[in-house]
C-alpha cells in the first residue's frame, strides 16, 4: 500500500469494528512484540486540558534532552500529527513503514480468528511501534479506552 491507501484503510476501520476489551489491546501489542515495554510512560487523564498538559510535559522533557514519543488525538490536518517523536510529527515514510508492521499483525490476528483492532487500537499500536523503533525514553499518552 502507499501512504494514501494506508490512510484510507485506517479511516475505514470504524465501519467494520466494534469496541474491544483491554485484553484485546494487550493481545494486539503482544503480537507486535510489546513495543511499549521498557519505556517510561506518562499517561494523562481528566476531563479538560489533557492536550495542554501533554504538550507541556513534552516540552519539559525535551528541554532536559530526553527523547519523547507523544501520542495524541485528534489530528487537525494530517493523521501523522497524532504520532510525534521529539516534538515532530512522524514523516509519511515512517507512517507508512509503521503502518505496514501493524497491518501485518492485524492479518495474523484475523487469521487466528481474532477481531480487527478498532481505529484507536490501530493508531495506538502504530504509535507504540514508531516509538520503539525510534528508541524514545518517554512516551506521553492522552487517555484512551476509558483511561486504561
Predicted regions and their residues:
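Short active-site-proximal "capping" loops at secondary-structure junctions
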Residues: 48-50, 75-76
